[in-house]
């Protein structure tokens, strides 16, 4: 096949406009699928030869040439052209140039429709596996960090207002739990990715005696698609992956938001290592948390990729439409962004320095043990709603008189409720507040250690 000749050109009397070739070409981005395209083609050739659709000699010739093409591409010695259209045609044209008409037999019982669906599933199966591993490394870093901070007490927040004292380890383990669910979503997503569409052909299957199960075995797919129309038009496996990725990025972004806030002079809870910050071109004193900010910013790109795919798919008639060419760049971008953000965060968090003294001091402020005082009254038999009202009035009294609860006299306590006794003062420490919450999933030292033991023994 000559470089300018189209594999579908038999029906046409004229040449494709050069502007159309440039407009419709996807080779500049889908060439990253070359390994998967060749892997699928080798399996397809083996199956065709096994079924007697092509001769064994032809199969051997095709497979050898495909291996050589892959080596050239691996080395960067392959010249891609716009008039190749896409990665499938680039490889097929090169194959025919090298081995002649025998190369034209490779596309027997196959369409680019099922071919590209196969390439994307092979690609995404591999990338999902890699992301699961990288995610696991970040989870482990959170776990190790938490084990070192079990006794570190910090203020917990709701509405970004100080709420109750918590262990820093409890905070860090919250992100471990989020990332653990993220990994579970990806593993479940990978299960649905791992279905082979090859053999669906254009949309209706093929009348040739192919063996889809054999091809699936070669490509390590545990199942083949059950509906050829679904197989070539389905991109929900891509959407599901990007959706799972968007949730991962949401979790990373929330953590980065906290780091950005905590690293300010107003909070001073954490110092981000200089290696992960930058300065200002005009203000010499600045130390900016650019890495954390960029993770937060790149989250928007992944969200945009998800909406792009949902919008792309929502109005497509069955089955394949050229619109589906636009699914690859959002997918590739999502894969790249998620991997880079997971890796950079993993490198950054192991070098964080927490200001334990500042966290402890701030944990005691803002009447953070007020709930403990209410629960103290509950233990004395006071209904919770009544206790809530009593403590609310106590807080108002302290604010009006510029006092803290631990500075109140017993007489002042008793003026609000007669059930207060000297043991109330023990409830007012942040250490007591943290460790009394010894329920499953609570912030006490004992509960955190138990959860870590569960994780490490699983």
What annotation goes with each model-predicted range?
Residues 41, 88, 92, 238-241, ...:
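Short runs of predominantly hydrophobic/aromatic residues within well-ordered alpha helices
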Residues 44, 65-72, 94, 98, ...:
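Generic, well-ordered alpha-helical scaffold segments in large soluble proteins
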Residues 2-40, 101-102, 283-458:
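Glycine-rich cofactor/substrate-binding loops
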Residues 53-54, 78, 268, 383, ...:
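Conserved hydrophobic residue
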Residues 2-205, 210-216, 278-279, 290, ...:
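A helix-coil-helix interface module used to build multimeric assemblies
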Residues 143, 147-150, 191-194, 260, ...:
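Alpha-helical coiled-coil oligomerization motifs
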Residues 120-121, 125-128, 132, 155, ...:
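Charged, flexible cofactor/metal-binding loops and thiol motifs
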Residues 44-54, 123, 170, 239-247, ...:
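Short, well-ordered beta-strand elements within core beta-sheets of diverse protein domains
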């Amino acid at each position: 096949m000559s470089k300018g000749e189209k594999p579908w050109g038999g029906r046409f009397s004229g040449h494709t406009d050069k502007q159309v070739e440039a407009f419709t070409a996807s080779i500049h981005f889908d060439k990253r699928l070359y390994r998967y395209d060749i892997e699928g083609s080798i399996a397809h050739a083996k199956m065709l030869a096994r079924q007697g659709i092509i001769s064994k000699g032809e199969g051997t010739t095709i497979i050898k040439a495909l291996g050589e093409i892959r080596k050239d591409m691996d080395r960067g010695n392959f010249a891609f052209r716009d008039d190749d259209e896409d990665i499938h045609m680039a490889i097929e044209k090169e194959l025919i140039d090298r081995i002649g008409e025998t190369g034209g037999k490779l596309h027997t019982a196959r369409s680019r429709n099922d071919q590209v669906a196969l390439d994307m599933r092979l690609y995404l199966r591999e990338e999902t596996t890699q992301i699961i591993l990288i995610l696991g490394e970040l989870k482990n870093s959170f776990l190790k960090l938490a084990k070192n901070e079990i006794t570190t007490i910090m203020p917990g927040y709701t509405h970004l207002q100080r709420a109750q004292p918590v262990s820093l380890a409890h905070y860090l383990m919250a992100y471990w739990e989020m990332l653990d669910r993220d990994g579970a979503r990806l593993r479940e997503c990978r299960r649905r990715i791992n279905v082979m569409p090859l053999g669906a052909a254009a949309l209706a299957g093929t009348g040739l005696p192919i063996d889809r199960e054999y091809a699936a075995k070669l490509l390590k797919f545990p199942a083949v698609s059950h509906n050829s129309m679904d197989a070539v038009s389905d991109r929900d496996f891509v959407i599901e992956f990007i959706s799972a990725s968007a949730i991962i990025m949401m979790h990373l972004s929330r953590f980065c938001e906290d780091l950005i806030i905590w690293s300010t002079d107003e909070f001073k809870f954490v110092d981000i290592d200089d290696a992960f910050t930058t300065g200002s071109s005009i203000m010499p004193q600045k130390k900016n948390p650019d890495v954390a900010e960029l993770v937060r910013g790149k989250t928007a790109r992944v969200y945009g990729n998800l909406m792009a795919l949902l919008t792309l798919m929502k109005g497509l008639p069955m089955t394949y439409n050229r619109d589906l060419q636009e699914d690859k760049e959002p997918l590739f971008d999502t894969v790249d962004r998620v991997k880079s953000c997971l890796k950079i965060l993993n490198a950054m968090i192991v070098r964080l320095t927490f200001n334990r003294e500042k966290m402890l001091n701030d944990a005691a402020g803002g009447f953070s043990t007020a709930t403990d005082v209410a629960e103290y009254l509950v233990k004395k038999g006071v209904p919770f709603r009544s206790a809530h009202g009593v403590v609310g009035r106590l807080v108002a009294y302290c604010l009006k008189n510029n006092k803290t609860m631990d500075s109140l006299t017993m007489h002042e306590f008793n003026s609000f409720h007669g059930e207060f006794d000297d043991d109330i003062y023990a409830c007012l420490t942040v250490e007591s507040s943290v460790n009394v919450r010894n329920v499953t999933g609570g912030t006490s030292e004992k509960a955190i250690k138990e959860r870590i033991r569960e994780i490490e023994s699983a």
